[in-house]
Amino acid sequence: MGLIKKHKYIITISFLFVTLYSLISLVNHYFFRTYALDLGLYTNAAFKYAHFILADSSMIKGCHEPILGGHFDLYLVIFSPLTYLFGTYTLLIVQIIALITGGIGIFRYFQIIGNKKSIPYYALIYFYIFFGIYGALSFDYHSVVVASCVVPWFFISIYRNKMVVSVLLLVFMLVSQENFALFVFFITLGLIIEYRKNQKKSYHLILLSLISLAYFLIVILCIIPYFSSQSEYG
């Protein structure tokens, strides 16, 4: 009870937005207002992964090409066991939880770097009302949205010198989709500039940026063409 009382404002704000996000995302799905692309395709893929079947794109293509030949998205594999609990709502629920977790990450980041008690709450609310979130929720599910919500926690890990944690978070973001790896590359470049006076952090971030770029290039040049029926990316 003490923990709840201590964080009552952030819990209340987050609960209100969980309700709002659910009214958009889950209600749309309940009334059959969600789409075959991407939610239908991805839910089908997650269901197949949960049953140890390699998911394909036969739902949208004439050939039985593995879905990994489109986007190299490993979140569908990671989240697939949850389909036994939540069925076709799985990815929508995961996305909502990710958004709330991302908001809390932003709150914590501003709480750590600043000394004004009100700023973290403003940052939290700003994130929750950001228009891009509602565009994503109204068009079902996106793995890159889930990955984006990890970014604040990545910032916190770098700020607090939690290098092992930062590597784990980086890997989790990279496996969302190949294009997000390029986004992470530029994030790390920005952090290199931010921490340019800290040699240890700079070297660590340079390594992470190179890992991100290498992952992006390997996936688009080698892995996706391997799974693609056209043997090329895109």
Where are the predicted features?
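Juxtamembrane segments of multi-pass membrane glycosylation machinery
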Residues: H51, G70, L74-Q95
